[in-house]
Amino acid sequence: MLLLRRLTAALFTLACLCGLLATGGTAHAANPETNRVATWNMQVGRDRWQGAAAIAQDNTVLALQEVPNEPPAGARYIGTIGNTIDHYEWTIARGVTRQLYILYTTSRNLAIATAWAPGEVVEIEGMYRPALMVTRPTDDVAFASIHAASGNGFDVRPLVQDVADEANGRGLNHWAVLGDFNLTPDRARLLGLPADARIYNSGQATQQSGNELDYMISNVDTEDWQATVGDNRGSDHWPVYFSALRAGALPPELTIHADNSDRLLDVFQGNDTNGTHVIQYHANGAVNQRWRLQAIGTSASTGHMMYRIMSSDSGKCLDVNRGQQSGWGDYLNIWDCHDIDGVPGSGGNQRDTQNFTLEHPDSRMPNLTLLRNNATGLYANIRNNDRGDGAWVIQWPDQFGRFPAPNESFYLHPVIANQ
């Protein structure tokens, strides 16, 4: 049965006439993935608008769920779109504003804050709760905030499909749905989502239950929406940020967590001596758990970009014990970074054991990453599938069948500046 849709729209031209263009936002981007986006379930708390403002300051799009009935301090009422969406110009910091749209519902309110004036603001009626969608014609994309039904997320598939249909109906080729799906990504992937849908997730718990419920589903194909779980801001959900591994002249810091253990790659005891083991260890905020990527060229064997994975602590590069003579089971370590051409090793940068490619064997889960050593063709692996602190990171042949092996699967999380 066709779902009834109630659509309301705010034209970009009217927004301009009313002086709604945000200040403090970014310049128009060339592609959908150049938008930095985030999602957070506020759990209705009126006092959580301050946390939402901090998240919005770091992102061009913020999707919110369980939004309180009262608007935030510093929000100037602009008008009502249709009967249910209130529009505010929201001052979130000195000289920085966001366009805030709150959709009032009989269940839980939704909101979206943007650094730009949307082309349209649309309510899409759902089986249980609606979706709130904004369009960005400049980037050929629509963004939507959803809060799926509790328990089993039975309405996820139709909500995502409706957003995709509404975006396509407006001549937009791309769409992204963010929110609380009340369903883990592993279950969401089995729902019969649109054929081009991808699930951008952090691989970590986002709710106090220990489940991962907050993420993004989109048809955009990119490595630039890596997910990071932010600090708790008073809700029973954590905010999730989506941003690039590479940005500007200085690559951002990142952490790398193993899917089998939820622990981070860590330079043993913060030692900066050549040959120091790389292990897994629980997150402690230390600099020896932070890394940077340096693009180094293209792999001749796979066609993928090669990266140096550099320790933020020592500036040394991830390498493998015994270098080009290494084999199955040799441990990963840090070492003085080689020259771009692989010197002092031989064979040029294609034979340099400090060069890794990021592989995504499951196209529908683009943040799930394998770290492949370009010289040896072997993969970073948590030895013996150990889940405890101190386990060695070794290299090993790939083990993935239908799905990648958890101890060879990693998530890369850009570090969030304003925590």
Which functions belong to the PLM regions below?
Residues 2-9, 18-91, 158-160, 236-238, ...:
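N-terminal, active-site-proximal structural segment of metallo-dependent hydrolase catalytic domains
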Residues 30-55, 105-250:
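Active-site regions of metal-assisted phosphoester/phosphodiester hydrolases
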Residues 33-36, 106-109, 128-130, 139, ...:
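Residues that flank catalytic or metal-binding motifs in active/ligand-binding sites
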Residues 42-47, 66, 150-154, 259, ...:
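Soluble non-cytosolic domains of exported or imported proteins
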Residues 69, 182-184, 188, 272, ...:
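Residue-level marker for beta-strand->alpha-helix junctions and adjacent short loops that shape enzyme
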Residues 73-117, 121-128:
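Substrate-binding cleft of extracellular glycoside hydrolase catalytic domains
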Residues 248-272, 290-326, 346-387, 405-419:
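Extracellular glycan-recognition/adhesion modules and their associated mucin-like linkers
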Residues 276-282, 330-336, 391-397:
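Aromatic-rich beta-strand patches that line glycan-recognition/binding surfaces
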